[in-house]
Amino acid sequence: MVDATSPPGVNAVVNYYVPNSDGSPPATNDMAVMLGQKDMISHKMRIRDLRPYKEEYSLDRNGFQYATIHSTLTDATDETQIKEVYYREIEKLVQDITGAKRVLAFHHAVRTRTGNEFGEQIKDRYQGVEGPAYRVHIDQTPQGALSIVQFMFPDLADDVRNGSFQVINVWRPLTRVQRDPLMVADAAEMPPEDLLLISRKYYNGLHSSNFVIKYDGRMAAGEGPTDGLSGDGKHSWWYIGDQEPTEALVFSSSGFRNGKAIIGTAHDLYSAEPMINAYERKNASSLYGHDESQI
């Protein structure tokens, strides 16, 4: 799609999951795996700036999309304002991008470098201040996305089970991103054999699952603008350079379309040398489910 030698970008370390030697899946609710504290290996990859090529990548085709948003939210710590103002703005943004007949906001998180207590995230039912993750992952499997939407919206359980829906993440910074940018992988090129399921069980009884990502390739970026080749595909990473609060990175977290699974987009944060001494990064991210079959 894009000449691999042309896009601006950076070389950065990307953290992947190291599978169990016996081929067994990660243990259910393995917090150390989820937080990137064990079974991890790092590869240097090329991360390309999406902004000059934003018209060439779409949510439907690649699993992510550049978008602009001019939010009227004035206080990212005010839960009422977030739900009454920001949710409506993001619902409209997602509806404009997808053409969905119905969009429902059901989660938000304000992330900083200081908060990293996964247990607190679970205790407060998906709300709160959360630290950044440092391992490549996909938030839900298609079945995990179905479980979450049915749990959050029980009156829609039959509709989503028999129709089409997708969980979508909208990632927007509160200030210009100066360190730990979000990167996303081109879903059209990601080899499915590199996705490994991990089961999750929440305190409230919800059962879900997400993907951790392995990398089997030997062609990491090194010092050149090269995608990481792995299996029959490649890991092609993108970010928005110096992302502003008026810019959003919209990406899929899995779902179903007419009974066919939609695999979400692998993503993570990364650090590059010029960013190490930059200021703290603040970000607001939200998840949205939309039922394309809803009238």
Curated annotation (Swiss-Prot):
Induction: Expression is positively regulated by the cluster-specific transcription factor pbcR. The keyword Chloroplast does not apply. It is an enzyme of class 1 (oxidoreductase). InterPro entries: AsaB-like. Its EC number is 1.-.-.-. Pathway: Secondary metabolite biosynthesis; terpenoid biosynthesis. Keywords: Oxidoreductase. GO terms for molecular function: oxidoreductase activity. It comes from the Eukaryota. One of its GO terms (biological process) is terpenoid biosynthetic process. Oxidoreductase; part of the gene cluster that mediates the biosynthesis of the diterpene ent-pimara-8(14),15-diene (PD). Within the cluster, the HMG-CoA reductase AN1593 functions in the mevalonate pathway, which produces isoprenoid precursors. The geranylgeranyl pyrophosphate (GGPP) synthase AN1592 is needed in the formation of GGPP, the precursor for diterpenes. Lastly, the pimaradiene synthase pbcA performs the 2 cyclization steps that convert GGPP to ent-pimara-8(14),15-diene. The putative roles of the remaining cluster enzymes in ent-pimara-8(14),15-diene biosynthesis is unclear. Belongs to the asaB hydroxylase/desaturase family. This is Oxidoreductase AN1597. It comes from Emericella nidulans (strain FGSC A4 / ATCC 38163 / CBS 112.46 / NRRL 194 / M139) (Aspergillus nidulans).
